[in-house]
């Protein structure tokens, strides 16, 4: 099990990222627009820098939904490889069977 504080911190990052996603993407699209003057683009960069760091989507860590493990998490299931193997072995994941040949 991962520390509860690290799981909670990641959850708050997800919420903050979702709430400020539209604002952040609008600023980025204006910054990369070459038709806007350099001074105005610089002011947009400064306003982007004023947003909280945790509102960036790159700060979010994929964690296992069951254990909170930060590494070895499959995107399709959202579960770490260890728990996924365990659940598949018990037959609890529908549509997935252990291969044998």
UniProtKB/Swiss-Prot annotation:
One of its GO terms (cellular component) is small ribosomal subunit. InterPro entries: Ribosomal_uS14 (IPR001209), Ribosomal_uS14_bac/plastid (IPR023036), Ribosomal_uS14_CS (IPR018271). Keywords: Ribonucleoprotein, Ribosomal protein, RNA-binding, rRNA-binding. It comes from Rickettsia felis (strain ATCC VR-1525 / URRWXCal2) (Rickettsia azadi). Residues 1-26 are annotated as: Disordered. Belongs to the universal ribosomal protein uS14 family. This is Small ribosomal subunit protein uS14. Gene3D superfamilies: 1.10.287.1480. It comes from the Bacteria. GO terms for molecular function: rRNA binding; structural constituent of ribosome. Part of the 30S ribosomal subunit. Contacts proteins S3 and S10. PANTHER family: 30S RIBOSOMAL PROTEIN S14 (PTHR19836), SMALL RIBOSOMAL SUBUNIT PROTEIN US14M (PTHR19836:SF19). GO terms for biological process: translation. Pfam families: Ribosomal_S14. Binds 16S rRNA, required for the assembly of 30S particles and may also be responsible for determining the conformation of the 16S rRNA at the A site. Residues 11-26 have a biased composition (Basic residues). The keyword Transmembrane does not apply.
């Amino acid at each position: 099990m991962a520390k509860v504080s690290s799981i909670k911190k990641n959850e708050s990052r997800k919420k903050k990222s979702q709430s400020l996603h539209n604002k952040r993407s609008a600023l980025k699209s204006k910054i990369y627009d070459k038709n806007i003057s350099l001074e105005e683009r610089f002011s947009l960069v400064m306003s982007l820098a004023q947003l909280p760091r945790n509102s960036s989507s790159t700060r979010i860590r994929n964690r296992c939904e069951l254990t909170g493990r930060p590494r070895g998490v499959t995107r399709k299931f959202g579960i770490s490889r260890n728990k996924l193997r365990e659940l598949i072995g018990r037959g609890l994941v529908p549509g997935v069977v252990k291969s044998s040949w």
